[in-house]
UniProtKB/Swiss-Prot annotation:
Binding site for substrate: R86
E.C. no: 2.7.2.15
Gene from which the chain derives: tdcD
Annotated catalysed reactions: propanoate + ATP = propanoyl phosphate + ADP
GO cellular component terms, semicolon-separated: cytosol
Pathway membership: Amino-acid degradation; L-threonine degradation via propanoate pathway; propanoate from L-threonine: step 4/4
UniProt site (Transition state stabilizer): H175, R236
Protein name: Propionate kinase
Keyword RNA-binding tagged: no
Subunit and partners: Homodimer.
Species per Swiss-Prot/TrEMBL record: Escherichia coli (strain K12)
Residues annotated to bind Mg(2+): N11
Length: 402
């Protein structure tokens, strides 16, 4: 065992690698960065928020070699005791995180057609890390696994049975690592017993989803077979009538691929506002009286509130609503509007607490008179991945999650 063990957390996206190095004793972040523009001539690496440096080799393997070199410069390479990989899709095979073996790799490859842009990139990261860090235990943490506790009535679509049986068409859900981390922290913040609790977690960012967590387990979530279903997002439409898209296709002669691009890349906040997918830009426009920016935000809020209320129906009781993600943690406007929209549930805002900076960390933002507690809990997916790696790799875990 290394005297100073660290965990390397790797998140390979469709064209990027985000990474963090965490102290295994307390999960403090020692180093982080991003390699972006992979498989393009503009590939670069930025470490600890520093100036981007061009990558000599533009592949995932080349980017991970550059990351390993940065660790070596900081005398961290030999301290890497565990590697945790974020895997986008585990299908129905993976119900929890797993130590990476040949069988696990084969099973990830089997479900990769469900998320081809990300899972194949995840596999490239695993294979490269195995070469760069031979003998180091690696762990796969799946974005979908937390939601595998959903009952069939929550994950099935009302489609012919053969599509589920033969093609695996069902709701899988995403943001599972975030929902799991935040719900665990919420039990502590709200002094709830994990096995007797009811929470709705709103992970709001450029991608956004709601999760109903009953007794520590996901029982419903807003995203579906893909991250497109559910809430309206930065550029994604969220829930949309298939018949509406069929009609659009008939009127515009657009192909299925064209429409898939529209609902994933040209819709949501961007589509309605015509201005931006960035909520910070839209909030500024909101205060300046930009009508379509205001309409985009109102639509975004309406969808969030409707999904929160709907997900609460999957609980035996509602102990708390938790805001997390880039928007959930940082936008006091969105939190206020959502809470006002949910007055029917007995929500009341504590304006002073809601307006505090996110640097204040975990906090309750509902008033003492509210029937349901609302809180802000910053997510930390990297820490959750590291903790899973520590648990499976048999390294002593920090006390709060031991």
């Amino acid at each position: 065992m290394n005297e100073f063990p660290v965990v390397l957390v790797i998140n390979c996206g469709s064209s990027s690698i985000k990474f963090s190095v965490l102290d295994a004793s307390d999960c403090e972040v020692l180093m982080s960065g991003i390699a972006d523009g992979i498989n393009s001539e503009n590939a670069f690496l930025s470490v600890n928020g520093g100036e981007p440096a061009p990558l000599a080799h533009h592949s995932y393997e080349g980017a991970l070699k550059a990351i390993a070199f940065e660790l070596e410069k900081r005398n961290l390479n030999d301290s890497v005791a565990l590697i945790g990989h974020r895997i986008a899709h585990g299908g129905s095979i993976f119900t929890e995180s797993a130590i990476i073996t040949d069988e696990v790799i084969d099973n990830i490859r089997r479900v990769s057609p469900l998320a081809p842009l990300h899972n194949y990139a995840n596999l490239s990261g695993i294979e490269s890390a195995q070469q760069l860090f031979p003998g180091v235990t690696q762990v796969a943490v799946f974005d979908t696994s937390f939601h595998q506790t959903m009952a069939p009535e929550a994950y099935l679509y009302g489609l012919p049975w053969k599509y589920y049986e033969e093609l695996g068409v069902r709701r899988y859900g995403f943001h599972g690592t975030s929902h799991r981390y935040v719900s665990q922290r919420a039990h502590s913040l709200l002094n709830l017993a994990e096995d007797d609790s009811g929470l709705v977690v709103a992970h709001l960012g450029n991608g956004a989803s709601i999760c109903a967590v009953r007794n520590g387990q996901s029982v419903d979530t807003s995203m579906g077979m893909t991250p497109l279903e559910g809430l309206m997002m930065g550029t994604r439409s969220g829930d949309v009538d298939f018949g509406a898209m069929s009609w659009v296709a008939s009127q515009t002669n657009q192909s299925l691929g064209d429409l898939e691009r529209v609902v994933n890349k040209e819709s949501g906040l961007l589509g309605i506002s015509g201005l931006s997918s960035d909520l910070r830009v839209l909030e500024k426009a909101w205060h300046e009286g930009h009508e379509r920016a205001q309409l985009a935000i109102k639509t975004f809020v309406h969808r969030i509130a409707r999904h929160i209320a709907g997900h609460a129906a999957s609980l035996r009781r509602l102990d708390g609503i938790i805001f997390t993600g880039g928007i959930g943690e940082n936008s006091s406007l969105i939190r206020r509007l959502v809470m006002e929209h949910l007055a029917v549930l007995g929500l009341e805002i504590d304006t002073e607490m809601n307006n505090r900076s996110n640097s204040c960390g975990e906090r309750i933002v509902s008033s003492e008179n509210a029937r349901v507690i609302c809180a802000v809990i910053p997510t930390n997916e990297e820490k959750m991945i590291a903790l899973d790696a520590i648990h499976l790799g048999k390294v002593n875990a920090p006390a709060e999650f031991a």
